[in-house]
From Swiss-Prot:
GO biological process, one term: carbohydrate metabolic process
Pathway as given in its UniProt record: Carbohydrate degradation; pentose phosphate pathway; D-glyceraldehyde 3-phosphate and beta-D-fructose 6-phosphate from D-ribose 5-phosphate and D-xylulose 5-phosphate (non-oxidative stage): step 2/3
Swiss-Prot/TrEMBL catalytic activity: D-sedoheptulose 7-phosphate + D-glyceraldehyde 3-phosphate = D-erythrose 4-phosphate + beta-D-fructose 6-phosphate
Protein name, UniProt field: Transaldolase
Gene Ontology CC annotations of this record: cytosol
Lineage: Bacteria, Pseudomonadati, Pseudomonadota, Gammaproteobacteria, Pseudomonadales
Function: Transaldolase is important for the balance of metabolites in the pentose-phosphate pathway.
Predominant subcellular localization, coarse grouping: cytoplasm
Description of how the protein assembles with itself and partners: Homodimer.
Pfam families for the chain: TAL_FSA
The enzyme's E.C. designation: 2.2.1.2
Length: 308
C-alpha cells in the first residue's frame, strides 16, 4: 500500500511550508514556502550560519536589506533541492502600502536574478489586504508572479481572482483555531470552518474559470489535509508531511472541478472593506497575522543587526 503522501501527490501538488533543507530533501515536495516566522526559525539552524554572515555583510548596515538578502539566500538553497518554486514574503509592515510593497517585491526579484535565478521560479508573498492585492495586480502585469497570503475570507479570494494573481494561500488552521475558541467545540473533516472556506473558494474559482491557483495553508491536523485532497496545491509543515508519509491508509479525492460554485461577483474597494469588516474572524485573523509576521521580521532584523 502506498502512503497517504504519495496518494495525495496524485491529485494535488504538495508544497513544503518550511525553510528546513533537510526536511525538504527528505520529503521531496514540488515547491516550498517561507515567511518571516519560518526564516527566523531557519536562522537558528546550523546550516544557515554562513548565510546569516553573508546577509549581514551584503546588507550594508540596513537590517531590512540584510533580511531580504537572507530570505533570498535561503530561497536559493531550497531551490537546489526542489523542482518548482520558492515563495518569499514581502515585509508585513508594508501590508497597507501598495507602492512600498511594489518596491520591496521588485528588490526581492532583483536579488534572485542577480543570483542567477529566474523570476519564473519565485513567487512573491504578499498579505491579502486591499493594498497588497493592488500591488500584486501590478506585479502580475509586469511578469512577477505572486502568492497572496493571510487569506481568511471569501471577499479576499474574490478580489485576488479579479486582480489576476497567480496563487492564493487560504488559511485553514487559523480559521479552525478561531471557531474552536469562539464556539468552544472541535470540528472534524468537512465540518471544519477552515476546510469549508477553502472548499468554497475552490468551487467558486473553478465554476467561474479563474486561473488563480488555490493552495490551502496552515494545517493543524491530518484530517484537514485529507478533507482538501484534490485542491490545486497544499502547503504543509514537515511534521504533517512526515505523518502522511508514514500513514498507509486509503486517501480519496475530495475536491475536483465541476462542483457547484457561486456566481462571479466583482468587489470594489468599499464592498471589499465592508465584506471583510462584516467577517469578525477574518478581520481579527488578518490583523493578528500581519502583527505576528511583523514581530518576527523585527526579531530577524535584530538578530542580523547583532551580528553586524
Amino acid at each position: 500500500m502506498t502512503s497517504k503522501l504519495e496518494q495525495l501527490k496524485q491529485f494535488t501538488t504538495v508544497v513544503a511550508d518550511t525553510g528546513d533543507l533537510d526536511a525538504i530533501a527528505r520529503l521531496k515536495p514540488v515547491d516550498a514556502t517561507t515567511n518571516p516566522s519560518l526564516l527566523l526559525k531557519a536562522a537558528s539552524l546550523p546550516g544557515y550560519a554562513d548565510l546569516l554572515k553573508q546577509a549581514v555583510s551584503t546588507g550594508k548596515g540596513d537590517p531590512g536589506l540584510a533580511c531580504d538578502h537572507f530570505a533570498v539566500a535561503v530561497g536559493q538553497e531550497i531551490l537546489k533541492v526542489i523542482p518548482g518554486r520558492i515563495s518569499t514574503e514581502v515585509d508585513a509592515r508594508l501590508s497597507f502600502d501598495t507602492g512600498a510593497t511594489l518596491l520591496r517585491a521588485e528588490r526581492l526579484i532583483g536579488l534572485y536574478e542577480q543570483a542567477g535565478i529566474g523570476r519564473e521560479r519565485v513567487l512573491i508573498k504578499i498579505a491579502s489586504t486591499w493594498e497588497g492585492i493592488r500591488a500584486a495586480e501590478q506585479l502580475e502585469k509586469s511578469g512577477v508572479q505572486t502568492n497572496l497570503t493571510l487569506l481568511f475570507s471569501f471577499a479576499q479570494a474574490q478580489a485576488c481572482a479579479d486582480a489576476g494573481v497567480f496563487l492564493i494561500s487560504p488559511f485553514v488552521g487559523r480559521i479552525y483555531d478561531w471557531y474552536k475558541k469562539t464556539e468552544g467545540r472541535d470540528f472534524v473533516g468537512s465540518e471544519d470552518p477552515g476546510v469549508q472556506s477553502v472548499s468554497r473558494i475552490y468551487d467558486y474559482y473553478k465554476a467561474n474559470g479563474y486561473d488563480t491557483v488555490v493552495m490551502g495553508a496552515s494545517f493543524r491536523n491530518l484530517g484537514q489535509i485529507e478533507a482538501l485532497a484534490g485542491c490545486d496545491r497544499l502547503t504543509i509543515s514537515p511534521e504533517l508531511l512526515q505523518k502522511l508519509a508514514e500513514d498507509e491508509g486509503e486517501l480519496s479525492r475530495k475536491l475536483a472541478p465541476g462542483g457547484a460554485g457561486e456566481a462571479r461577483q466583482t468587489l470594489d474597494e468599499s464592498a471589499f472593506r465592508w465584506a471583510l469588516n462584516e467577517d469578525a474572524m477574518a478581520t481579527e485573523k488578518l490583523a493578528e497575522g500581519i502583527r505576528l509576521f511583523a514581530r518576527d521580521q523585527e526579531k530577524l532584523e535584530a538578530l542580523l543587526a547583532a551580528k553586524a
